[in-house]
């Protein structure tokens, strides 16, 4: 199941609704751990990733695996894949108002790799897009936290479009 919201209170409620003891959870965009604390109310294995400078010190205080990295990078995906190959819950909050195209690409890459049962995404642009659609043609629907149309694709290759938005720093 895929859930979408903008309000952070709704985001945390949606996470609480789907999480169970024993789940393997990947949290993309943990910042300083406020949502991580909600996730850790259950007995779960949590891998939290964020590239903000404030994240590291706060995340060290919590019982989880923290990776200080950019979730848009293929190297980050590979680093997490070495730790686990599947997850039960994928939580994505890249700032709430962050560019919806980037958030969708991150969702696509991470969910197609880890095949979560549930994905929760916090992003205003995606909510606005969803609520603005006046007609949908085609009978495509997914029951899990990833799109069925790419369920057998494995780890996707690096998406070259990311370089158009966030080019690698020059040496």
List each language-model region with its residue ranges:
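Conserved SAM-binding strand-loop segment of SAM-dependent methyltransferases
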Residues: 63-73
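Conserved class I S-adenosyl-L-methionine
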Residues: 22-31
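C-terminal substrate-binding/active-site "lid" region of AdoMet-derived donor-dependent transferases
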Residues: 96-171
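Conserved SAM/SAH-binding beta-strand->alpha-helix loop
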Residues: 52
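Glycine-rich SAM-binding Motif I of class I
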Residues: 33-37
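Conserved SAM-binding loop
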Residues: 59-60
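S-adenosyl-L-methionine
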Residues: 1-22
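Short amphipathic alpha-helix with an adjacent loop that forms part of the alpha/beta core around
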Residues: 74-85
């Amino acid at each position: 199941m895929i859930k979408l919201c903008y309000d952070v209170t709704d985001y945390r409620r949606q996470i609480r609704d789907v999480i169970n003891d024993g789940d393997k959870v990947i949290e993309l965009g943990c910042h300083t751990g406020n949502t991580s604390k909600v996730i850790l109310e259950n007995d779960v294995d949590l891998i939290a990733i964020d590239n903000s400078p404030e994240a590291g010190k706060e995340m060290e205080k919590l019982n989880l695996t923290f990776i200080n990295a950019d979730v848009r990078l293929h190297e980050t995906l590979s680093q997490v894949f070495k730790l686990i190959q599947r997850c039960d819950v994928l939580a994505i909050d890249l700032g709430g108002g962050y560019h919806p195209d980037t958030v969708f690409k991150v969702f696509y890459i991470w969910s197609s790799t880890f095949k979560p049962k549930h994905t929760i995404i916090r992003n205003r642009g995606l909510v606005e897009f969803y609520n603005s659609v006046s007609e949908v043609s085609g009978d495509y629907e997914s029951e899990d936290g990833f799109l069925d149309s790419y369920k057998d694709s494995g780890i996707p290759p690096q998406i070259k479009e990311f370089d158009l938005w966030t080019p690698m720093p020059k040496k």
